[in-house]
Amino acid sequence: MPAGLGALFEPSADPLADVQRAIAAAGLTERRALVVLGANWCHDSRALAARLQQSPLADVVEQHYELVLVDVGFLERGRAVAQELGAANYYATPTVFIVDPASGQIVDDEDRHLWGNAYRVSMSESVAYFEKWAARHLAPDPTAGSPQLGQLYARIDAFEAQQADRVAAGYAVVGPMLAAYKAGNEPEEFEASWNELRDFRMAIPGDIRALRDE
């Protein structure tokens, strides 16, 4: 995609406050908050950011969502926002969190990770996705009335938290390499480290869903 197109992610002094304001504004207008974690170095992030500004998707977003873009830098930021919203971490750039302002619940838990390949998602697919989650009712708590299932889900959450910590540790290693690579000084071990971390983090959402579906 053309250089600079969709480069809309800007560092913020207080991204948590930005997200909280978006959720509050969404509640006042009976919409949902659309929180996008991404970065300008990431072509998938720029692709989604650009598409969000273009009709017909821009019209859907304006009608149904309060949008906030969160810059994750070179992977050193963003986890605090994900955790504030109830997620263990973000596993891709971009990551899309659609939040119901009344409950604070993330509503697109089942398929939000597809945006890690946002460049390949068409405009029509994008419109269908955001129209779907604008209208979808909140899912009932699957553990309600079942202490045994609640305990199982708690163990799965603890497992994901461990995996999310491993991803955060990987970001701390790979992030500076990524910054050097983007500056034209690629470290010798960057490609292997990046690919290893990418494969690990991108597998986590599917693994967690498989555990919950067993």
Regions found by a protein language model. Give the residues of each.
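Extracellular/periplasmic catalytic domains that process cell-envelope and extracellular macromolecules
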Residues: 27-29, 59-62, 87-92, 101
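Post-cleavage N-terminal segment of exported redox proteins
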Residues: 1-11
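Short, solvent-exposed loop/turn and secondary-structure capping segments
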Residues: 45-49, 79, 107-111
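A short beta-strand-turn-helix
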Residues: 13-33
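Thiol-based oxidoreductase modules, predominantly thioredoxin-like and allied folds used
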Residues: 9-16, 37-39, 50, 54-79
